[in-house]
């Protein structure tokens, strides 16, 4: 796969998956208040909705496909009505195919209203968190779920805190280089299949491992290596920002390669420009050490705006001018 390919995105997730997963990834605990088939309800959008106007009867442009948040304001509005008016307002609300309802700040739904939601097949949950915190955590979760992503053939390594994505055709030794970097104290994020996410309009790309492959590597001539078992917990990372792409190339004497490093190359991943370093491979070349230097050069430029090639060029020009 080329790095320039178009990203993918989930179209929806089930409410059952939402309920089972969000508590594992964020500091929020949802309590189930009714029993309905949560597999039949799907969430299509990352945005949430507080349905004050819908409860008041104004349902034009009601974004019912979003997760509905009922906080202190919405519950106070319902509770101030007599039972018939309250049921009428809530009935007008649950006639839409809502994914689910979440009550915040430990608010409670009257039994008759909960029964109406159950009859409509709408899951109802509650949380002790405030509406503000609940919406922040759920939006963060849904942002991750609906982010652009793509799978790439390569290896992802944390080198001196810099996220380095190794790419190149099969058989060039990407896995061997990644393994050598791990042995030298760096951390493996993923090998063979690298899953890269871009959340919203952010310019940050996050690389993760394929959950089926985990931290296993295939080394030609050796077989499968379990990096976590062999090198311990220090040798693995769950995720890392993609900051530099290193492309391994077959040596071709007819081709001209970068010698000074003055020309900065980039490659585009999910619409984000990432620095690209192309390294030709030939016998005796220590690729591992070179990749460590690539990471150190990135840190020098990032923190001090220092580029060795530019510094050398400036020094030579100064000497000539003298």
Curated annotation (Swiss-Prot):
Coiled coil: none annotated. Residues 217-226 are annotated as: Important for the catalytic mechanism of both phosphorylation and dephosphorylation. Mg(2+) binds at residues 175, 218. Gene3D superfamilies: HprK N-terminal domain-like, P-loop containing nucleotide triphosphate hydrolases. GO terms for molecular function: ATP binding; magnesium ion binding; phosphorelay sensor kinase activity; protein serine/threonine kinase activity; protein serine/threonine/tyrosine kinase activity. The active site is at 153, 174, 192 (proton acceptor), 259. Residues 280-285 are annotated as: Important for the catalytic mechanism of dephosphorylation. ATP binds at residues 168-175. SUPFAM superfamilies: HprK N-terminal domain-like, PEP carboxykinase-like. GO terms for biological process: regulation of carbohydrate metabolic process. The keyword Transferase applies. Its cofactor is Mg(2+). It is an enzyme of class 2 (transferase). The keyword Magnesium applies. It catalyses: [HPr protein]-L-serine + ATP = [HPr protein]-O-phospho-L-serine + ADP + H(+); [HPr protein]-O-phospho-L-serine + phosphate + H(+) = [HPr protein]-L-serine + diphosphate. Keywords: ATP-binding, Kinase, Magnesium, Metal-binding, Multifunctional enzyme, Nucleotide-binding, Serine/threonine-protein kinase, Transferase. Its EC number is 2.7.11.-, 2.7.4.-. Belongs to the HPrK/P family. The Walker A ATP-binding motif also binds Pi and PPi. Catalyzes the ATP- as well as the pyrophosphate-dependent phosphorylation of a specific serine residue in HPr, a phosphocarrier protein of the phosphoenolpyruvate-dependent sugar phosphotransferase system (PTS). HprK/P also catalyzes the pyrophosphate-producing, inorganic phosphate-dependent dephosphorylation (phosphorolysis) of seryl-phosphorylated HPr (P-Ser-HPr). PANTHER family: HPR KINASE_PHOSPHORYLASE, PROTEIN YJDM-RELATED. NCBIfam families: hpr-ser (TIGR00679). Homohexamer. Both phosphorylation and phosphorolysis are carried out by the same active site and suggest a common mechanism for both reactions. This is HPr kinase/phosphorylase. It comes from Chlorobium phaeobacteroides (strain DSM 266 / SMG 266 / 2430). The lineage of its organism: Bacteria, Pseudomonadati, Chlorobiota, Chlorobiia, Chlorobiales.
